[in-house]
Amino acid sequence: MEELMKALCRAWEDEWQGMVMGELRYSKGEGETNGPCEISWSGRKIIRIRAVKGAGRMEILLFPFSGKTVGKKREDKGTWWHTFSEEEVRSFSLALEDHNEIHQSHRPVVSGFQIASALTKGKNFERLRIHFHHPLYAGDAVYLKQAGNRDYGSSDVLCFEAVME
């Protein structure tokens, strides 16, 4: 999974600066994963970027960041899960060679890749899909609420919804 994340980061275009991830899809697939990654992207306002390596596949959607808080404050947030520190966010971003400055700013946005890595750590799954509803900032406590095979991650508002299968 990390190799596909790095491949997507290497595909970076300057005009994508400041955009936020709206969706991440990952599939381990079966069979051989050797060989180079194939990268493709399309779109102008909403950017779809795909990386394929052997049977593994990752796709993300990038959207312009509006800066607006969307959604109501959540009363039942679930159980505390994680609080990403500024240093943790910046280090993860640098290790992936993620060029988006929003992960290095004075109040860094937690990378969707970092959320995916933390959610899947130590878990056995074949597919992952995360919809990002609101940026999560370093220093904000994240609470998880599970409903079936879905995890809802919230700070004050719903930040992401993840499904692992």
Language model features: what each stretch is:
Residues M1-E30, L96-R127:
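Active-site helix/loop of acyl-thioester processing domains in fatty-acid/polyketide metabolism
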Residues M1-W81, L136-E165:
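HotDog/MaoC-like acyl-thioester-processing domains
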Residues E75-P108:
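A contiguous, surface-exposed recognition patch within enzymatic or periplasmic domains that forms
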Residues F92, H131-H133, C159-F160:
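Aromatic-residue hotspot detector
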Residues K123-A141:
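A conserved acidic, glycine/proline-rich C-terminal tail/linker
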